[in-house]
Amino acid sequence: MSAPVITNIEDLRELAKHKVPRMFYDYADSGSWTESTYRANEADFQKIKLRQRVAVDIEKRSLKTKMIGIDVAMPVAIAPVGSVGMHSADGEIKVARAAERFGIPFTLSTMSICSIEDIAAHTKAPFWFQLYVMRDRAFIERLIDRAKAARCGALVLTLDLQIFGQRHKDVRNGLSALPKPTLANLINLATKPR
């Protein structure tokens, strides 16, 4: 069987829907509460139009720039996504390596499965670390020290962890801080082992 032809994000979404266990797919492809922000973000992206330029010299075009003093291939970065390792073994390492190959920053989530040290051991380029600001200051300081030691080039502060947003699909799927192994989840995991 040949690999599917991927031409856009929707193709990737459909591929993931069939290859990834439902609870993990829903985690990545949903938001909290009513998902109104998630839907608004998608709608805002649909409003962005690329403008074609004609009759101009494109011989020396380049997206290269600097972000916080670091040379990058284009002005984008991989945003922090918690628990990427749920979707693929060593998921964060794979994403960090891909970002490195493309010359863009990778941001490791505080909620990642791979550690800060794992990413540093498997990449050469500096990466960014997303830091949730929490009450336990000693824990925060230890995370910052680990990020420095792992050559993180930036801390991306996240301030919205005052309370966890209720993610309705995660609740339905039994995916929580302590996942509930329901029969439906176990069957889904067994049939989609990626």
Language-model features and meaning:
Residues 32-33, 110-114, 135:
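Short beta->alpha linker loops
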Residues 21, 78, 99, 157:
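Conserved, mostly hydrophobic/aromatic
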Residues 76-79, 104-108, 127-131, 155:
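Hydrophobic faces of well-ordered beta-strands that scaffold small-molecule active sites
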Residues 1-69, 174-194:
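An N-cap/entry alpha-helix motif that binds or orients negatively charged groups
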Residues 77-89, 129-138:
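Active-site mouth loops of central-metabolism enzymes
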Residues 64-75, 84-96, 112-124:
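N-terminal active-site wall of soluble small-molecule enzyme domains
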Residues 94-110:
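Catalytic domains of carbohydrate-active enzymes, especially glycoside hydrolases
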Residues 83, 96-97, 118, 122, ...:
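Alpha/beta enzyme core
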